[in-house]
């Protein structure tokens, strides 16, 4: 049986890891052992942050809706409650976009919410 030298395989594997650390600072982009740890950690951060991204965007939408609602004399929770009672089916992402870019339409929604709360 012939002797298998693993130089080619190891070199290819190292090259793959070092390619993923391109742009990293110092040894993290040059030394395989450090680069491998950096790639593992980057993967952990990416996994965690894909989940955090959803929470952060929801928090941003709520902050924007709250700001728009307060300009129209409502709090965020009263605005959402009023819209639910008025049977306005609109998600927070779209509502936040309306609050940012179309104040007139948002004011109309706020009035609808106020009407539903009063009734």
Swiss-Prot record:
One cellular-component annotation, GO: ribonucleoprotein complex
From the Swiss-Prot or TrEMBL record, what is one GO molecular function term?
rRNA binding
Extract one GO BP annotation from the record.
translation
Record key words, sorted: Ribonucleoprotein, Ribosomal protein, RNA-binding, rRNA-binding
Q: Which Pfam families match?
A: Ribosomal_L20
Q: Which Gene3D superfamilies match?
A: 6.10.160.10, Ribosomal protein L20
Would the keyword Repeat turn up in this protein's UniProt record?
Answer: no
This molecule's function is given as:
Binds directly to 23S ribosomal RNA and is necessary for the in vitro assembly process of the 50S ribosomal subunit. It is not involved in the protein synthesizing functions of that subunit.
List, alphabetically, the NCBIfam families matched: rplT_bact
What protein family is recorded?
Belongs to the bacterial ribosomal protein bL20 family.
Q: What is this protein called?
A: Large ribosomal subunit protein bL20
């Amino acid at each position: 049986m012939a002797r298998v030298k693993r130089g080619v395989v190891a070199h290819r594997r190292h090259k793959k890891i070092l390619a993923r650390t391109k742009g990293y600072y110092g040894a993290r982009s040059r030394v395989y052992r450090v680069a491998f740890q950096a790639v593992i950690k980057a993967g952990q951060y990416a996994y965690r942050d894909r989940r955090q991204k959803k929470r952060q965007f929801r928090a941003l939408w709520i902050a924007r809706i709250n700001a728009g609602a307060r300009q129209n004399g409502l709090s965020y929770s009263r605005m959402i409650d009023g819209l639910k009672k008025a049977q306005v089916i609109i998600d927070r992402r779209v509502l936040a976009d309306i609050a940012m870019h179309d104040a007139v339409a948002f004011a109309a929604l706020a009035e609808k919410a106020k009407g539903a709360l009063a009734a």
